[in-house]
Amino acid sequence: MRIVEQIKSEIRQALADAVSRAVAAGALVGPAPEVFLETPKAREHGDFATNLAMVMARQEKKAPRVIAQAIVDHLQTEGTWIESAEIAGPGFINLRLRQGWVHQVLPAIQAEGADYGKSDHGGKQRILLEYVSANPTGPMVLVQARAGAFGSSLARLLNWAGYECHTEFYVNDAGNQVKILARTVDLRAQELRGATVEIPEGYYPGEDVIDCARALLEQYPDFLEKPEEERLAFLERWAPEYFRSGHERVLRSYGVEFDRWFSERSLREAGAPARLVEWLKERGEAYEKDGAVWMRTTAYGDDKDRVLVKSDGEYTYFAADACYHKDKYDRGYATLIDILGQDHHGYLGRMKAMVECLGHPRDSLEILFTQMVRLFKDGQEFRMSKRRGNYVTLEDLLEQVSVDAARYFFLMRSLDTHMDFDLDLANLKSSDNPVFYVQYAHARICSILRQAREQGLEVPAASEVDTALLADESEVELMRKLAEFPEEIIGAADAREVHRIPRYLNELATLFHQFYSRCRVVSDDVPLSRARLLLVDCTRTVLANALGILGVSAPERM
C-alpha cells in the first residue's frame, strides 16, 4: 500500500473509532459516515484535515465545532502516527503527524524505483481514449499538437493509476470530404503535368495537396493515363493514407503513438451503418421521415433528432460516429473518453444522447475539449511566413522548439483554457523556462551522484541509512512532497487534469533547489552524507517518473 494512503487509512480508522467512543459515551448519536481527508494548503494547519464534524452536523443536530470537540476528546493517538488534533474554523479537525512518518517514504521510493507512483486504484477498469483524430486531408495543426501531448500523457496517467487505458486515432477516411480530396489531388496532378485547371470552391487549397499530388506522380508516373473513374476510386483510398501516414510519422517524432488507428471506411465496408440502423429500428430508437432515417435523440435530452441516413441514401457523419462508439462499447470498454476540438462543442448534447440511445449510461462517455493555441515571439503573435496558408503545423512548431519544450508547455495549462505559447521562453536556457527548471533539477542530482561516486560514496540501501538525520526543514518539506506523488497521480488521473503533474514537478524542483542551497549533500559527516544521497536519489526517481508520464526526457547532463 502507498505510504501516504496507509497513514491516511490509519487516520480514518482512528477518527471512526473516536466517533464510536463518543457515541458510547453519549456525546454523539452516530454512526460515523465515510471519513474524507485532505492536505491543507497552509502547512501551519497540519498534515491532514477533515470536515467530518460538518458532515455529521445534520444527523447530530449540533454545531460542527461541538461535534468536532467530541471527536477530538475521544481520539486515541497512542500507537498511531497522529501527534495532535485541533479544531479550526467552522469545525474542521486539523491533524499533525509525528515527524518520523515522512522518513518512511524513502525506503518505499527506493524499493519501487521506476514504479513509484503506480497503484491499483483504477481496478483495471477498461478505458478507451480517442484523441487527435485529425482529418486525413491536411497536416497536423497546433490544436491537434496540444491534444496529442495531452492525450498521450493522460493515457499514461490512467495506466499509472491502475486503469487499463487503450488509445485510438479515428481516421475519417470515408464520406464526402474524401471524395473532394480525391478530386482535388487529381486536378493538382493534372496541373503538375502542365494542364490548366481551376480548383472549384470547396476543394482543398494549399501546398500540402500539391505535395500529395507530386508524391502520387513520383510513385505512379503514368497515373493520369488511367480513366478518371478509376483514378478517383484509387485516390479515395490512396490520398487519405498519404496524409494519415504523415500524421503517424510526425506524431511519433513528437512522442505520440496509438494502440490502434481505426478506419471509418472499415466500418462502412463491414456494413456497420446498415446494421446499426436496423438495430435501432428494432429497439424503437430510429424512424423514417421525409425519406430519411432519424435517431430519436430528443428522447435523451438532445434539442432535435439526428439524421442517420439522408434522403439520397448516404449515411451521415453522425451515423458513422454512432457506429464507432457502438463498436467501442461492444469491445468491452466501460468508459470512453473523446478529446475533440473546441469547434465541436455543439456536439456534446447529441453525443451524450447518442450514448443513451445505444443503451449505455450517459456519463460513460466523457468529452474533453481542446482550446486554441497562439504562438508568440518577441512579444508579438507569431505567424510563420510559409507556403501552406494561414495555419501553423506541428512540424513548423518543432522547427522552433524541442519536443520536450513543446509537450511540457502544452501540458502546463488546463486543456480547456486558451493558450499563448511563448517561443522565446520555451527556448530559454535558464530557470525562467519551466521545463528547463525541472530538467535541470534532475541533471543537477545526477551530477551530485557522479561527484559522490568519484569520492567513493554510492547511494546506500535505505535499510542502511539513519533517515532520522534528515531533520532540516528543507529536507522534511522535500520528503513530504515526494510522499504526495502517488496521490497526485490518482487525483490528476481521476480529474483528467494532466496539468497537475507539471505543477507538481515545479513544486518538487523548487523544494529540491531550496534544499540544495541550504544543505551540503556530501560532507565530512559520512552518515549524514549517506542519508542525503538517498534523499536526492529518491528525488531523482520521482522527477524522472513524473517527466516520463508527460513524455518529457530526464537528462543526466545539461
Swiss-Prot record:
Short sequence motif named 'HIGH' region, residue ranges: 134-144
SMART domains: Arg_tRNA_synt_N (SM01016), DALR_1 (SM00836)
Enzyme class: ligase
Record's keyword annotation contains Magnesium: no
Location of the protein in the cell: Cytoplasm
Recorded GO CC terms: cytoplasm
Keywords in alphabetical order: Aminoacyl-tRNA synthetase, ATP-binding, Cytoplasm, Ligase, Nucleotide-binding, Protein biosynthesis
GO biological process: arginyl-tRNA aminoacylation
EC number: 6.1.1.19
Key word ATP-binding present: yes
An example Gene Ontology molecular-function term: ATP binding
Catalytic activity: tRNA(Arg) + L-arginine + ATP = L-arginyl-tRNA(Arg) + AMP + diphosphate
Classification via InterPro entries: Arg-tRNA-ligase, Arg-tRNA-synth_N, Arg-tRNA-synth_N_sf, ArgRS_core, DALR_anticod-bd, Rossmann-like_a/b/a_fold, tRNAsynth_Ia_anticodon-bd
Major localization listed first in the record, in broad terms: cytoplasm
Subunit text: Monomer.
Family: Belongs to the class-I aminoacyl-tRNA synthetase family.
Protein name as annotated: Arginine--tRNA ligase
Species assigned in the record: Symbiobacterium thermophilum (strain DSM 24528 / JCM 14929 / IAM 14863 / T)
